[in-house]
Amino acid sequence: MSQYQLIDKRVPIALNNPSITHDLDKCKNCTLCRRACADVMSVLDYYDLDANGDVPVCIHCGQCAAACPFDSMHARSELDKVKAALADPEKIVVIQTAPAVRVAIGEGFGYEPGTFLEGKMVGALRALGADYVVDTNFGADLTIMEEASELVDRLNKGGQIPQFTSCCPAWVRFAEIYFPELLPNLSSTRSCIAMEAAMIKTYFAEKKGIDPHNIVAISVNPCTAKKAETKREEENAAARFHNDASIGMDTDISITTREFIRWIQEENLDFNAIEDSQFDDLIGMETGASIIFGNTGGVMEAAMRTAYKLVTGNEPPPHALTHLEEVRGMNGVKEATVQLGDDVTLSVAVVHGGKNARDFLNALKENGKHYDFIE
């Protein structure tokens, strides 16, 4: 008999789930979490709990928590680890923030949704004790360069096509579980947060004269799957670079925007009164392409801009790529044809949501339609 009850009404969550936890006392059996997991993400109902050894399948996307109106299903908090790091005088705390946070945090303090509050966000992190605050957009630029370069290399050398983006850990987990045959098609590029964390414990540490053993790298972002990503065994590039396993994982702690808001409230900071501050330099600069990462289709658009430059040697003209309307918007599946100069034409697609991804990939198996790049 399964230890998970009422799975016809709610999502089963393992006690050791690194991203999501479930307070059953708050659960009203409203089925919203279940519908999000089964109907929107196509995870629940797409495996047999008994056949899987009574171990729930989870891609850590957090859609169940987003759907729960009672705070029964929520992200696993790591604020205690953050506070412990800040209280340790031996530690240097470096916090990176994803682009979405600066326009989402205001809702927790009475601002209109979408209000741009980068300065206050950085100022709040400094007031909370961060030694350095850096912008994940720098890591996004690294992702763009690697992903676009890899795509061009595959096209030139006859590599596995289509190339899928790989910077979303929930999508990577989804592919590992349900479409393992497509793993060779995934880009080797890590998420922008993971790449920047590795840079913090290597390049940043060297330039600032900091022992990487003393760095605690923290990420603030809207994604619960990033919590699980920090614990994947391959997420230790800095330790491998230094040939020293004691450096640990690249990202030590990942907290969500909601956790960040709660942290500010717990410390009784007056967010409205916080003075604006700026990101630290060195890895605090970014291009405009990195900022659109937070949009559905943004990774595709940014990668196409860079691929154009790699293929032609020139910046794309304004009419060519800077307004890729076809891959923007909230439709579940979007397709476009991209011209990279005179000689290269790419078929691309943007898919969001697990159910849309499952349907798209199953259709792709059947119809064999050609794509070069898929986000």
Positions of PLM-derived features:
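Iron-sulfur-associated redox domains of electron-transfer enzymes in respiratory
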Residues: 75-375
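Short helix/strand-bridging catalytic loops that position acidic/His residues to coordinate divalent metals
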Residues: 46-54, 181-187
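Iron-sulfur cluster-binding cysteine motifs and their immediate structural context
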Residues: 4-6, 10, 19-22, 26-52, ...
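Short low-complexity stretches enriched in small and charged residues
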Residues: 48-60, 116-121, 173
